[in-house]
Amino acid sequence: LGNVLVCVLAHHFGKEFTPQVQAAYQKVVAGVANALAHKYH
């Protein structure tokens, strides 16, 4: 689900969605997913 969100953001922002921005969003999404996994596992 997190990767889908990143894809939607990339499509929405176009050229403004640089590899650096993608890396930042991927890091946030991974952190949130990890936190949720630990809370509900």
From Swiss-Prot:
One Gene Ontology cellular component annotation held by this UniProt entry: haptoglobin-hemoglobin complex
Globin domain boundaries: 1-41
Keyword annotations from UniProtKB, A to Z: Acetylation, Heme, Iron, Metal-binding, Oxygen transport, Transport
Record-listed N6-acetyllysine modification sites: K39
Tissue expression per record: Red blood cells.
Superkingdom of the organism of origin: Eukaryota
Keyword Iron: yes
Pfam families per UniProt: Globin (PF00042)
GO biological process, one term: hydrogen peroxide catabolic process
Gene Ontology molecular function: haptoglobin binding; heme binding; metal ion binding; organic acid binding; oxygen binding; oxygen carrier activity; peroxidase activity
Keyword DNA-binding: no
UniProt cross-references to InterPro entries, sorted A to Z: Globin, Globin-like_sf, Globin/Proto, Hemoglobin_oxygen_transport
Function recorded in the entry: Involved in oxygen transport from the lung to the various peripheral tissues.
Family membership noted in the UniProt record: Belongs to the globin family.
Known partners and oligomeric status: Heterotetramer of two alpha chains and two beta chains.
The protein's name in its UniProt record: Hemoglobin subunit beta
Annotated organism of origin: Colobus guereza (Mantled guereza)
